[in-house]
Amino acid sequence: MEADPAPSSTPPPSSPAPAASPSRHPPGEEGGGAERVEVEEYVDPPSPDCCGGADPDHAPPPSPKGEEPVVSAEEEQAAVAGGEGEALRSFLEEFGDQGDDSLVPSPKLKQINTPDRLAALRFLGGKYNSLLERYKQQVAKCAEECAPRYDGLKKKYADECAERRRLYNELIELRGNIRVFCRCRPLSTAEISNGCSSIVQIDPSHETELQFVPSDKDRKAFKFDHVFGPSDNQETVFAESLPVVRSVMDGFNVCIFAYGQTGTGKTFTMEGIPEDRGVNYRALEELFRLSEERSSSVAYTFAVSILEVYNEKIRDLLDESSEQTGRKLDIKQTADGTQEVAGLIEAPIYTIDGVWEKLKVGAKNRSVGATSANELSSRSHSLVKVTVRSEHLVTGQKWRSHIWLVDLAGSERVNKTEVEGDRLKESQFINKSLSALGDVISALASKNAHIPYRNSKLTHLLQSSLGGDCKTLMFVQISPSSADSGETLCSLNFASRVRAIDHGPARKQADPAETFKLKQMTEKIRHEEKENAKLLESLQLTQLKYASRENVIKTLQEKIREAEQTSKTYQQRVRELENELANEKKAARDTARSTKPPLAPMRQRPPLGRIGNHIPPKAPLRLRLSKAPTIQNKENIPVMLNKGSSGADTSKAVAGKARRVSLTPVIRHIPLQPKRRSSLAVLPTQREQLSIFPDKRSVSRLSHIQMPRRSIATFNSIPATPLAAAAHKQVDGTPEARQLRRIEFSSSKFRSPPALARFNSRNNALSPQQKLRLASGSGNASKICFSVQKRVILGSPAPVKSSLLSGTGIFNPALREKMMAAKIGNAQRVFNTNRRKSVL
């Protein structure tokens, strides 16, 4: 078959030669020169077979995978030797640079007349294969260099996602929001056969967003904590729920419940199937795994309870007795504010197999029924409660927490499910309880003061989970079918309201006994804080008082220092004055010694009568009158004399027995004398002595009365004779005489009875005339001692005089002051009003 020259001269547009792969290397690379040398080796005249009878259209095109055409060495040598490649050589010489880089434009290539088209294709094929090989090498090299960086960035991205999820979970816990996970089931076979389409769009790169697209024009976005698509399995769903489940082991209350319309997969998510178990079983399995992991420090015990709310009645699903249908269970509120079902069975569990057995028993006893929407539709709300009690083995601290796993009955439309009879009644109760749940959610989202928890048994049981101290997770199950768009939209709106609830962060739940202890400790701490506040206030007041007293003390100290300084000044002044006074006294004494002549010796002194001109004048008398001592006043206490007692009859004085001898009076009349040495006594003159004693002109020097030594001779100046008594009344009746009347004979603090009675009773031999003889005469007057002190005069006893003095001269006050008071033995006692006026 001959070749057409026209087509051979101009290649067809579909020729692969112009469509060569562009170069992956820059024009200046060394590899291009090497390949140019190799190409020049191939440029030889083509063989006659190729030029003559070969059809260029049947030439093998270059392999896109880089397979080079098989050309033997003999053919290459023949082509070079034959010189059939002159046209190709001229082409390479003209377009060598462009050909090396495979950048020859196709229009330029079309205008070249090449007789050897096959050689050009071989050349381009080889060039393409070499470039492709170089490209693969570069890709492998880049992949080798970038693989570690890619792995690092991938790991960093995963860590950042985990950190963001952790921070988001912490934020939710701090805010107290209810976590909401949305799970969309796949379309069922019946829905696909009915021509239903999906109205839910989920972007795998945005795990928290969901697009609700009921039509091309309508589109609404919803945001949740996580969105699971139809392809997500049970393990993926539980992995996101794992942090909430683990918090039960730390002492927090947890509630996980599934909400949605009938047939959306709530029971499948919570319970699952034996081949692919749900959240309930996986959560309990995780709890047992954590208990074994922490067994060295914390001891855990588990108990499970399963109940259902059917037609607003609570049934215990673990009670298989025949009486359980008629048994009524009520909800009680405990002291710590949580809700408990009185009489509910709490079965202890020890292994995960025991958990599965209990769950199967509860699922068997649960109320289910067939509807047009679901053959095994749940006709009640199922609640699984797991109580976890833990005790720290080191500190002894105890906690009690629980986890609620709730599978709610599906909300449904009566006209759509086509139920009647008992199923219709069940649907009404289900919708009523779900409506009450919606009211509670709305009230919580609006933060109303009153939350209607008691409108339904379901909401009453979930009170602590929805609005209390609990971590809550909600699965909202939706259907992607366009036939259920209304129910899906309602479920999404309800889940959005639930996600907006903010009830504060959850707290650890302690054991009730521990709670009571904590309350007592809290009360004690509060009381101590009040006491501390009072003490602090008292301390502050004390500090203020102390500060004020410090100021007062400082002021007083200043005053004390000033007073001390003044005292020192005064003391200095006093010393100076004392020195001056001492000097003056010394000077006065010196002057007195020099001016006053010395006194003569006592034996050489002249008689008192001869120096009468030197007697100083008498000082004024200060008389102190007092009563005579009585028997009652034994202490000789001076008593002033009453005026009415001046006329009393002294002869009637009662004599008493004295315990002590009174020698000196208590009170003496001492006239004030100047401080001069004048020891001269005033004695009665000779005329006065003669007037008193007219019948006695000369007496002995000293008169004595011999008496026993233990006796005392004391007498009153008032004579016992009638004449003397009358004279006494005459003289003593005047005021002057009453003032001068003093008769006190006591020198002791013990008083003596009246001296007259004693003298009369013991010394009857002494007559009144002998008493008058006791007065000294003119002979012994110069030697009588007139002094306060006792003066003893030794001498012979005075002879008893028998002469009786007549007249009233003895009542003269001047003479009566000088009368002798008593005599004991050879000692005579006399009165003297002038102190230190004595002449021996």
From Swiss-Prot:
Domain Kinesin motor per the UniProt entry, residue ranges: 177-501
Record CDD domains: KISc_C_terminal (cd01366)
GO molecular function: ATP binding; ATP hydrolysis activity; microtubule binding; microtubule motor activity
GO CC terms: cytoplasm; kinesin complex; microtubule
Nucleotide-binding in keyword set: yes
PROSITE patterns documented for this protein: KINESIN_MOTOR_1, KINESIN_MOTOR_2
Taxonomy, superkingdom: Eukaryota
Single GO biological process annotation from the record: spindle assembly
Binding-site residues for ATP, renumbered to this chain: G260, Q261, T262, G263, T264, G265, K266, T267
Coiled-coil intervals: 517-594
Region (Disordered): 1-74, 581-617
Family indicated by similarity: Belongs to the TRAFAC class myosin-kinesin ATPase superfamily. Kinesin family. KIN-14 subfamily.
UniProt protein name: Kinesin-like protein KIN-14J
